């Protein structure tokens, strides 16, 4: 069961308490905001986590209107060291063509670090990655596919630095 840090207000509380749920007990945290949150709110939340020594992974970046409206804004988050996760179903088009287009642009520009399912457990929204893995391997290369699905997740578990995507 993966816990994620939801939004800046909750982040403020847990930052003060020093009790942030991390992935595999390391420094990486999954952070999720409301799709309606503004860019400054998201950027500030990520910055505060980084300043506290955490490595934020922005969950389903393609679903935030303020991010998906501009590759420059996504680039700003990427440039400040925020790790970017996109959902497999978004890549495959289940969330509309605009979300699909932006998710695929993140892949094309090598700005995504992870692909996930958004399945918070194995009962609801069951994980299904097979078609997405094949798609990414065909369209973006086997090496990048391995980074997204194997190498980078392994580095989170080991609490190791994740290299820039190339």
Short names for language-model regions:
Residues 60, 118, 153:
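Conserved, mostly hydrophobic/aromatic
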Residues 7, 63-67, 91-94, 120-124:
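Active-site environment of divalent metal-dependent phosphoester hydrolases
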Residues 96-102:
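Short loop-to-alpha-helix "cap/lid" segments that border enzyme active sites
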Residues 45, 73-77, 102-106, 132-136:
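A general structural detector for well-ordered alpha-helical segments in enzyme core domains, enriched
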Residues 111-127:
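Short acidic/histidine-rich active-site segments
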Residues 129, 133-166:
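Mid-to-C-terminal alpha-helical segments outside catalytic/metal-binding sites
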Residues 83-86, 91-93:
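Aromatic-anchored helix/helix-loop segment that forms the rim or "lid"
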Residues 1-85, 163:
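Extended substrate/RNA-proximal surfaces in nucleic-acid metabolism proteins
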């Amino acid at each position: 069961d993966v816990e994620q840090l939801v939004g800046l207000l909750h982040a403020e509380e847990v930052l003060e308490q020093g009790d942030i749920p991390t992935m595999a007990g390391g420094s990486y945290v999954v952070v999720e905001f409301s799709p309606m949150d503004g860019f400054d709110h998201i950027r500030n939340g990520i910055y505060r986590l980084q300043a506290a020594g955490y490595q934020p992974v922005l969950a389903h970046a393609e679903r935030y209107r303020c991010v998906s409206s501009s590759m420059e804004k996504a680039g700003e988050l990427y440039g400040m060291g925020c790790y970017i996760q996109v959902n497999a179903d978004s890549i495959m088009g289940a969330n509309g063509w605009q979300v699909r287009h932006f998710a695929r642009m993140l892949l094309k520009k090598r700005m995504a670090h992870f692909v996930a399912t958004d399945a918070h457990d194995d009962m609801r929204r069951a994980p299904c990655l097979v078609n997405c893995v094949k798609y990414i391997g065909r369209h973006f290369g086997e090496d990048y596919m391995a980074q997204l699905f194997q190498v980078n997740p392994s580095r989170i578990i080991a609490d190791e630095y994740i290299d820039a995507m190339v």
